[in-house]
């Protein structure tokens, strides 16, 4: 009896010791995580830029219905961001399929505005997709695209966003593309001027990623509220099979040169990321070099995290990009 009792007592003691050690380990890890988060927050105060989150970083959980796009402000706040960059295609189907699209648009905007206020977030810009080709050589189609973008200018004004991001798809001949793009941008920027909204062109593939041509377009438009949104990674000029997306890139504009040439017209900046090495560095983009270009241009606004990788979860990729921006920014 005594021997059995001693064995039971010994087993109980070992179990208690194990639980105690695990508890201590978790407590230390939690404290370490909290300290790291606090240090990151403190370090952000000394940066030359603020951090925003591009909603596209969450496209996978949104498309798989794991995340309601209406909860974007809450998720961005949880991840430690201050600003929001919305992607309109996440709301377009709901709006377009409604019995009264105009009324549904207002419901969506009211919801987004309420959420941003609830979580103390700043609405920065709307990324517009699927509203027509602004660089089309067909004047009727081009003007219709301008008209279709105007509702999002109104939406940006209502939400308090400073800009909308547009694409310049359409013509494939450089001279035709420049003339068509400049025409559409002038018309849209003129409308947006009265709404206190900027029209920003992102390098988003093909001729819009040929930054020499894009700069010419900016000079042709020559309006204060028409500018650029440099993206660290979107410099593909041509893909296999002539595809717009997905296919392998076979020709690319020099990315650092491209960002440097876009910065004089920049009113927002997008920090694209894909994969990271063991030290947390982006594997194909030198973030310190990119941030130096941005800082040297005198930019002090928001930099938006836009993670597009597949090797880690969206949350992990977003935080890795955010941490890299903070780390690289502190070194400048």
Summary of predicted features, one role per range:
Residues 121, 197, 297-301:
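A short helix->loop->beta-strand "cap" motif at the edges of active sites that frequently abuts
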Residues 11-20:
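Bacterial N-terminal signal peptides
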Residues 46-47, 182-292:
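Acidic/histidine-rich catalytic cores of soluble enzymes
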Residues 155-176, 195-207:
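Active-site groove signature of glycoside hydrolases
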Residues 2, 21-158, 163, 176-179, ...:
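N-terminal pre-domain/capping segments
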Residues 266-279, 300-314:
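Active-site clefts of carbohydrate-active enzymes
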Residues 1-8:
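Positively charged n-region of N-terminal signal peptides that target proteins for export
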